[in-house]
């Protein structure tokens, strides 16, 4: 495709912000609001620290406004609390798991998903991802305890092409996508 403007426009003014695990330790934060984000499949929770700083995290199932979220070591094993993988017992569902310590969370972030802590091996922890794949991570990587909210979003089928069009439009995606073999070579 040649010339002109982009085929799609991303409505980024509607996106509330990035959802990452904050780089704080030993803090207790309060959920001030639950926010719908068109670009995320799970709801976001606006969380406020005692010093007034605010950030977004992906909301776990059962999270509500006014709930306390503990961040750091030796926290209670309640859904929504954030701690290191080495502190979480085996068999516990976790979400928003960091790939490297301090990166903010990379795994098990879509609505209704969770990873499971399989085994703790000293300086590394093995988790089972939602795909079923086993992954070894550093024991200092942090994760949120519990299952993510927003499950059941795929239960309602897309009955019309228009529904798929508006879903893609909200996320800034192009719909429908034409396969390359159906185009002229010059139009790729």
Map each language-model feature to its residues.
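S1/OB-fold single-stranded RNA-binding interface
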Residues: 42-46, 54-56, 105
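Beta-strand/loop nucleic-acid-binding surfaces
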Residues: 52-64
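Short acidic-glycine loop/turn motifs at beta-strand connectors
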Residues: 49-52, 131
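Conserved strand-loop elements at the edges of beta-sheets that form or border functional pockets
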Residues: 49, 59, 119
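Basic, glycine/proline-rich low-complexity segments that contact nucleic acids
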Residues: 1-42, 63-188
């Amino acid at each position: 495709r040649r010339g002109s403007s982009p085929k799609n426009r991303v409505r980024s003014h509607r996106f509330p912000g990035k959802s990452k695990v904050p780089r704080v330790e030993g803090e207790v934060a309060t959920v001030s609001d639950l926010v719908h984000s068109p670009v995320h499949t799970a709801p976001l929770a606006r969380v406020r620290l005692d010093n007034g700083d605010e950030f977004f995290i992906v909301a776990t199932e059962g999270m509500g406004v006014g709930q306390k979220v503990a961040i750091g070591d030796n926290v209670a094993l309640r859904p929504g609390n954030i701690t290191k993988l080495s502190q979480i017992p085996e068999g516990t569902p976790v979400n928003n798991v960091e790939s490297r310590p301090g990166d903010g969370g990379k795994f098990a972030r879509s609505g209704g998903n969770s990873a499971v802590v399989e085994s703790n091996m000293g300086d590394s922890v093995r988790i089972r991802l939602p795909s079923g794949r086993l992954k070894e991570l550093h024991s200092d990587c942090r994760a949120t305890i519990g299952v993510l909210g927003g499950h059941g979003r795929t239960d309602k089928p897309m009955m019309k092409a228009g529904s798929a069009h508006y879903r893609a439009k909200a996320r800034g995606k192009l719909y429908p996508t034409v396969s390359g073999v159906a185009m002229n070579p010059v139009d790729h």
